[in-house]
């Protein structure tokens, strides 16, 4: 069976959908080769994926001075590595998921006349995808109304959604009437610094108001903030678990009644797959503000709540959490709306991939 390259790097948002597609394609009998970079290496720790994985040493070109020169040298080296990978494996197709790691592989794919398709997770077409779209066989998208997509390429669009990893493809049975209320705080694969102060201060207000709930917090924090966040929850006598990354994130979703999170495409796909009611706080300086569009797509479907970072305060967050804690019917109806938004993105994307494989 032919080899398929899956390429994505930089953040978990680019890596995890590639892994999800890899799992589906491997079940269909294809040889999968996952290519990412050193920034994503930590997300592969403790994993047991059976497909091949290559980790490239990429450096951001946003550096200045001697670091910028070093970055260009690394890019040249990555192009040489990409040449060797494509030449030695002769993939039947390349599928990319974003991040500048895709460039050396796509360039060599074009050189060797290997077809490739792009996947856009967000509601706004990213820079790398805009750059290579003219050469792509197709672009698979999460949102039918993806912005920044030139009309001349609309014929290449296939709506598939964003695939999620096998471990996250289930719908938990949550009891929203329970007085044991678990709150999940996630800031994407890299954590979110603002949540380190915003959420504990909102919980402080919650602890001091009159209610009969037992609150548990599971909080993914920026590594440098972990001790501070733990100390805050300990002072409030709140049961908590704080880490910079949860390898068993499926269990955290399964046991949580409400999430507070960013609105990156991977997170959005996960909360839809797991029907997780969530308060979305879009990252305000995401590329082309795509997280705001992602969050509004959820909120407009009454499948979650969007509060922009420029307006959110501990008191506003406290009021929203407190209202939802006391509204099990609203949480249940939100879960139902998310269930209605679920699609089998892994299957749809794998079907699209099979149309373009060179045998």
Swiss-Prot record:
Entry GO terms, CC: plasma membrane
Binding-site positions, UDP-N-acetyl-alpha-D-glucosamine: 11-13, 122, 165, 189, 291
Membrane topology per record: Peripheral membrane protein
Keyword Transferase included in the entry's annotation: yes
Family: Belongs to the glycosyltransferase 28 family. MurG subfamily.
Primary localization class, coarse: membrane
GO biological process: carbohydrate metabolic process; cell division; cell wall organization; lipid glycosylation; peptidoglycan biosynthetic process; regulation of cell shape
Annotated NCBIfam families: murG
Compartments reported by the entry: Cell inner membrane
Enzyme nomenclature, EC number: 2.4.1.227
Protein keywords: Cell cycle, Cell division, Cell inner membrane, Cell membrane, Cell shape, Cell wall biogenesis/degradation, Glycosyltransferase, Membrane, Peptidoglycan synthesis, Transferase
GO molecular function terms listed in the Swiss-Prot or TrEMBL record: UDP-N-acetyl-D-glucosamine:N-acetylmuramoyl-L-alanyl-D-glutamyl-meso-2,6-diaminopimelyl-D-alanyl-D-alanine-diphosphoundecaprenol 4-beta-N-acetylglucosaminlytransferase activity; undecaprenyldiphospho-muramoylpentapeptide beta-N-acetylglucosaminyltransferase activity
Gene: murG
Job of this protein: Cell wall formation. Catalyzes the transfer of a GlcNAc subunit on undecaprenyl-pyrophosphoryl-MurNAc-pentapeptide (lipid intermediate I) to form undecaprenyl-pyrophosphoryl-MurNAc-(pentapeptide)GlcNAc (lipid intermediate II).
Name the record gives this protein: UDP-N-acetylglucosamine--N-acetylmuramyl-(pentapeptide) pyrophosphoryl-undecaprenol N-acetylglucosamine transferase
Biological classification of the source: Bacteria, Pseudomonadati, Pseudomonadota, Alphaproteobacteria, Rickettsiales
Organism: Orientia tsutsugamushi (strain Ikeda)
Pathway: Cell wall biogenesis; peptidoglycan biosynthesis
UniProt keyword Lipoprotein, yes or no: no
């Amino acid at each position: 069976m032919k080899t398929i390259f899956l390429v994505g790097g930089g953040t978990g948002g680019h890596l995890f959908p590639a892994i999800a597609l890899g799992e589906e394609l491997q079940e269909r009998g294809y040889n999968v080769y996952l290519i990412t970079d050193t920034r994503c290496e930590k997300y592969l720790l403790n994993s047991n994926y059976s497909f091949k994985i290559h980790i490239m040493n990429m450096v951001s070109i946003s550096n200045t001075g001697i670091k910028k020169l070093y970055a260009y040298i690394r890019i040249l080296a990555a192009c040489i590595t990409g040449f060797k990978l494509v030449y030695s494996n002769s993939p039947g197709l390349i599928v990319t998921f974003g991040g500048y790691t895709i460039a050396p592989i796509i360039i060599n794919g074009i050189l060797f006349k290997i077809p490739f398709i792009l996947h856009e997770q967000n509601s706004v077409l990213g820079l790398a995808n805009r750059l290579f779209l003219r050469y792509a066989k197709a672009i698979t998208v999460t949102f039918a109304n993806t912005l920044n997509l030139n009309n001349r390429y609309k014929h290449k669009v296939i709506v598939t959604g964003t695939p999620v990893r096998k471990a996250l493809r289930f719908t938990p049975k949550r009891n929203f009437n329970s007085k044991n209320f678990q709150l999940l705080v996630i800031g994407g694969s890299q954590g979110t610094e603002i949540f380190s102060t915003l959420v504990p201060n909102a919980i402080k207000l919650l602890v001091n108001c009159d209610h009969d709930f037992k609150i548990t917090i599971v909080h993914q924090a920026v590594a440098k903030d972990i001790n501070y966040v733990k100390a805050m929850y300990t002072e409030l006598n709140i049961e908590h678990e704080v880490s910079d990354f949860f390898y068993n994130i499926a269990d955290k979703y399964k046991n949580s009644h409400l999430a507070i999170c960013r609105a990156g495409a991977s997170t959005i796909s996960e909360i839809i797959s797991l029907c997780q009611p969530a308060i979305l706080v879009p990252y305000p300086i995401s590329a082309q503000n795509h997280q705001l569009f992602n969050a509004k797509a959820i909120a407009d479907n009454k499948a979650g709540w969007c509060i922009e970072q420029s307006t959110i305060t501990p008191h506003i967050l406290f009021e929203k959490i407190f209202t939802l804690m006391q509204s099990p019917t609203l949480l249940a109806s939100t879960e139902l709306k998310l269930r209605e938004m679920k699609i089998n993105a892994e299957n749809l994307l794998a079907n699209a991939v099979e149309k373009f494989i060179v045998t």
